[in-house]
Amino acid sequence: MWLGRRALCALVLLLACASLGLLYASTRDAPGLRLPLAPWAPPQSPRRPELPDLAPEPRYAHIPVRIKEQVVGLLAWNNCSCESSGGGLPLPFQKQVRAIDLTKAFDPAELRAASATREQEFQAFLSRSQSPADQLLIAPANSPLQYPLQGVEVQPLRSILVPGLSLQAASGQEVYQVNLTASLGTWDVAGEVTGVTLTGEGQADLTLVSPGLDQLNRQLQLVTYSSRSYQTNTADTVRFSTEGHEAAFTIRIRHPPNPRLYPPGSLPQGAQYNISALVTIATKTFLRYDRLRALITSIRRFYPTVTVVIADDSDKPERVSGPYVEHYLMPFGKGWFAGRNLAVSQVTTKYVLWVDDDFVFTARTRLERLVDVLERTPLDLVGGAVREISGFATTYRQLLSVEPGAPGLGNCLRQRRGFHHELVGFPGCVVTDGVVNFFLARTDKVREVGFDPRLSRVAHLEFFLDGLGSLRVGSCSDVVVDHASKLKLPWTSRDAGAETYARYRYPGSLDESQMAKHRLLFFKHRLQCMTSQ
């Protein structure tokens, strides 16, 4: 019997080695298959045109330059495209790049109309979101004018003293003169200096003339700017000039950011934070009431007084109640992101912890650790890790970037695994762009980004794409929540609810919800395609 088992094991091992040998030989010699890929890199685009920014000024055209291709390749070329790694037999641990052409969600005539409408909406967006403060200003060389480079700000229809104005001219001139010109406001002075002549007080153009340089500079210290056009967030590019020299700087016009502060609550004895006063746990459920109740039970073992908010769009909702539990019902199948919006809208604490309804809290689900990260860093959101029944835990750290495309075509979204850098002072934590579906976030920032309710069945990373550039994201691998097992044992009874859930939660690649998502990304984010690792 023992020899028979040993012979069987040897046979299995021999077959496995032979299979691996054949696989290696086929991938090594077959002309139609590729070698394992190198670490992920953006797909190669067609030959790039010359960058206009590298063209010399006419007076320097005769000077030879050796272009550094490695550096030039890092610059934006505004002609991105998306390509899969393609071909080959996928091998374990081999990095593959998957590309999605979002334009394939449209027929040709519809694509032309959608592209034209999208471009029109994009130009309207630029006109709303950009201001003169975004314009490039280049300071002139060796100017005698002293002026503020940045940091001058005024509220709409209010006045300020303009700091830092001065003329550093050579002494001995008969007369000194400077001019100030504005477009959205007017100039005046808070006091008049003897020996200085003013022209244009209370107007958009102000001239100051004096035979004495010191008197002129003292007068410049008293110059005021008044906003005359009610715009809540813009900038006035003003001109400051003297004979033979002119400079420009911006005065930002806006209301100061209004804070939204939350009381931290009294600290329990020996505790660093009052988690019940700082954190609300939010989840979205659909049909899986057994899993939801298991989640709540596990939460109560460690956080008995933390509020749990539930958004529910089940067909036949069951009552879920208890201390510190809020259960909100929605129309049947309203959707994944719509449920997130509803749950987050009811949060009254500084932070919201998002969890799936089939998670299970353990001793390693330490919310204090996540709160500490947000309290002591500028991050807006920090994710943890989700542990599967196999013991494997994932943080799903994702890097997102958008590359500019050719005019009218849209941009390219790049998604790959990884992080930007470690978070100083917090071992096991990093800074990234997207995390797993278990995260603690500042409630106001989550509401600011929001969850697009048009994404009803399959969505997650789209939230981080909406927040790219405004949402500061981190991830800590040492805060872990368990994921309830999805394994179905063959001897268990058929679960109609689980089958219904699976139909809604896991649509096929050709399902209409997937096509609708591609059309949404094409228009909403002005994308033509996307690649993922």
UniProtKB/Swiss-Prot annotation:
Transmembrane portions of the chain: 8-25
UniProt-listed SUPFAM superfamilies: Nucleotide-diphospho-sugar transferases
Spans within the Cytoplasmic topological domain: 1-7
GO cellular component, one term: Golgi membrane
GO terms (BP aspect): carbohydrate metabolic process; determination of adult lifespan; ganglioside biosynthetic process; glycosphingolipid metabolic process; limb development; lipid glycosylation; lipid storage; motor behavior
The keyword Glycoprotein appears for this protein: yes
Superkingdom assignment: Eukaryota
Gene3D superfamilies registered for this protein in UniProt: Spore Coat Polysaccharide Biosynthesis Protein SpsA, Chain A (3.90.550.10)
Keywords: Disease variant, Disulfide bond, Glycoprotein, Glycosyltransferase, Golgi apparatus, Hereditary spastic paraplegia, Lipid metabolism, Membrane, Neurodegeneration, Signal-anchor, Sphingolipid metabolism, Transferase, Transmembrane, Transmembrane helix
Recorded metabolic or biological pathway in which this protein acts: Sphingolipid metabolism
Side Lumenal, residues: 26-533
Main location: Golgi
Protein's job: Involved in the biosynthesis of gangliosides GM2, GD2, GT2 and GA2 from GM3, GD3, GT3 and GA3, respectively.
Subunit structure: Homodimer; disulfide-linked.
The protein, known as: Beta-1,4 N-acetylgalactosaminyltransferase 1
Encoding gene, per UniProt annotation: B4GALNT1
